[in-house]
């Protein structure tokens, strides 16, 4: 998202915004404040999360990321599978890198 925001985009519609809302807002605010070093740092961390959630079951991976941050867990409906154990581990690791586990707002502070 950083390159788009830096070029003047007024926002975005992406699953990553739902998967890591606090870090996504901080990224937006950093670009608007001209703090491109912080924005790029957040962008790189969000890319790690994006690579963990993007798959044929993106909705399930996004919901899993949300549940790790304190939102009530939900389930997938057939034929969509739940996030696999490998996907869950990658998502957890990416959220740890953002400081976003358990509803924490560390990434946004």
Question: Model-predicted segments: where are they?
Answer:
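Structured C-terminal cap/extension of enzyme domains
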Residues: 2-109
């Amino acid at each position: 998202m950083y390159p788009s925001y830096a070029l003047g985009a007024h926002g975005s519609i992406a699953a990553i915004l739902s998967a890591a809302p606090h870090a996504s807002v901080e990224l937006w605010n950093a670009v608007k404040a001209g703090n491109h070093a912080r924005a790029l740092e957040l962008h790189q961390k969000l890319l790690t999360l994006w690579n963990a959630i993007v798959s044929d079951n993106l909705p399930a991976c996004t919901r899993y990321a949300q549940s790790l941050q304190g939102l009530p867990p939900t389930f997938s409906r057939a034929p969509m599978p739940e996030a696999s154990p490998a996907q869950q581990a990658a998502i957890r690791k990416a959220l740890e890198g953002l400081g976003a586990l358990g509803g924490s707002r560390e990434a946004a502070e």
